[in-house]
Amino acid sequence: MNKNIKYSQNFLTSEKVLNQIIKQLNLKETDTVYEIGTGKGHLTTKLAKISKQVTSIELDSHLFNLSSEKLKSNTRVTLIHQDILQFQFPNKQRYKIVGNIPYHLSTQIIKKVVFESHASDIYLIVEEGFYKRTLDIHRTLGLLLHTQVSIQQLLKLPAECFHPKPRVNSVLIKLTRHTTDVPDKYWKLYTYFVSKWVNREYRQLFTKNQFHQAMKHAKVNNLSTVTYEQVLSIFNSYLLFNGRK
């Protein structure tokens, strides 16, 4: 099979592991699911046994044709041959997202599903190190994601679970959407603030006196142990100092 390395995938084929994953998804008969990466259709088939409707998006032509043949009689499954990064999720429909995503595109895809979809729950299989980076509020990605979703690990998936076997372990994570911590009208300011904050360009955000006031108000004694809630407090101080509130 000719592979586009950028979009290459490591497939889950073990029935035991697939069943463990399905159990963690806690799907209902009324659920509509969007799957990222049909692959060979192993997970797709199991999703369709429980959910009302599964729409599965696959870019690789060979895999799309293979899965189309395998799933052609399954009325609960709709296959779409498209790049997930170009796919438009519905605005007014309730749905969940499930995906075993390519490691190389983890950042792009997680941003896509969090910021360009309205999914209530998102389940992704990602590289273990990437999962840890999503929790790191000293990084841009962590500070952006936390405004919209909470993130938790559901299952650890050793490299032996996949074919071909990757060099790293993976995890199944759940992203649960919550009310945004940053209203839309402040989003551009927040992304600017975060870009400066993670690079410690504090002078681009505050005067010396403002910085000390913001730290005091957020009760920050040590910047190396700052919490997400404290960063939000500091951002609110930034808005106040700039007459935005």
Swiss-Prot record:
SUPFAM superfamilies registered for this protein in UniProt: S-adenosyl-L-methionine-dependent methyltransferases
Binding residue positions for S-adenosyl-L-methionine: N10, L12, G37, E58, D83, N100
Annotated Gene Ontology cellular component terms: cytosol
Enzyme Commission no: 2.1.1.184
Pfam families with a match to the protein in the record: RrnaAD
Catalytic activity as recorded in UniProt: adenosine(2085) in 23S rRNA + 2 S-adenosyl-L-methionine = N(6)-dimethyladenosine(2085) in 23S rRNA + 2 S-adenosyl-L-homocysteine + 2 H(+)
Role this protein plays: This protein produces a dimethylation of the adenine residue at position 2085 in 23S rRNA, resulting in reduced affinity between ribosomes and macrolide-lincosamide-streptogramin B antibiotics.
Xref: NCBIfam families: Erm23S_rRNA_broad (NF000499), erm_B_23S_MT (NF012220)
Protein's name in the database: rRNA adenine N-6-methyltransferase
